[in-house]
């Protein structure tokens, strides 16, 4: 799956492709849409250093197919309509669209080579940040949009059976805190942070983006960016299908058969 900046960038770009009524809902509930762009990832940050029941929800919902996840959520929204919930739904759709198209490539590359999953994602975020003129990439704080009011956390909790509004609030708050810490400008602090995170898992140390690009990942960026562009092309059709399913219970097509990844 792509990392945080890729998801945020994708969702911001997809706003311009949305019909007027959907775009207006998203603008009214922009915080919910923006957090929705990270889908179930927020659970990974509930307590990133130890295994928890809430933390495991991230893996649980990522293993669901789009059919399973969106059918359940849309059923709930038909029974209890919520414009705020729909704004979050469209954000999650962006997350799903990008994850489902990019994740198989990331998995294949991490299995075939010496480069880890998280490292590939972090380097692709660097690629996008530099493409957007945000330099140095390793010092970019992308946490500004990761915030929800208590009542908005209750909206999000409806999407994830087993989660409470308080757990949602903690996940979002900690996600923002971690992203802010990862953007520290002090080199020694970055090294210490990488070592500390590495205690939990050697692979996790790759969350701390290094000052210079990793040459082992350079050949993967173009392939991932091609998939990113494919996701941009695919999104309008997914949005159309999801809208019909939400409104008329029309069936979701084969584009919703992959898992989140």
Regions found by a protein language model. Name each.
Residues 1-89, 93, 97-261:
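N-terminal leader/auxiliary helical segments
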């Amino acid at each position: 799956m792509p990392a945080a900046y890729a998801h945020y960038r994708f969702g911001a770009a997809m706003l311009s492709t949305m019909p007027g009524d959907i775009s207006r809902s998203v603008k009214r509930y922009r915080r919910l849409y923006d957090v929705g762009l990270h889908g179930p990832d927020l659970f990974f940050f509930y307590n990133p250093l130890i295994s928890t029941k809430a933390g495991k929800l991230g893996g649980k919902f990522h293993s669901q197919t789009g059919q399973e996840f969106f059918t359940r959520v849309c059923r709930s929204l038909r029974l209890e309509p919520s414009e705020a919930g729909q704004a979050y739904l469209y954000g999650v759709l962006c997350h799903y669209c990008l994850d489902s198209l990019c994740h198989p490539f990331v998995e294949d590359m991490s299995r075939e080579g010496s480069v880890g999953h998280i490292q590939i994602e972090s380097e692709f975020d660097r690629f996008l940040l530099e493409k957007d003129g945000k330099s140095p990439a390793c010092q970019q704080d992308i946490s500004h949009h990761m915030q929800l009011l208590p009542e908005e956390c209750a909206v999000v909790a409806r999407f994830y059976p087993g989660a409470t509004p308080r757990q949602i609030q903690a996940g979002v708050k900690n996600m923002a805190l971690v992203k802010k810490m990862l953007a520290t400008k002090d080199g020694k602090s970055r090294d210490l942070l990488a070592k500390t995170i590495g205690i939990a898992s050697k692979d996790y140390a790759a969350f701390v983006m290094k000052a210079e690009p990793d040459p082992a990942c350079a050949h993967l960026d173009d392939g991932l960016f091609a998939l990113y562009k494919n996701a941009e092309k695919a999104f309008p059709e997914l949005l159309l299908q999801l809208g019909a399913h939400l409104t008329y219970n029309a069936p979701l097509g084969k584009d919703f058969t992959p898992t989140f990844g």
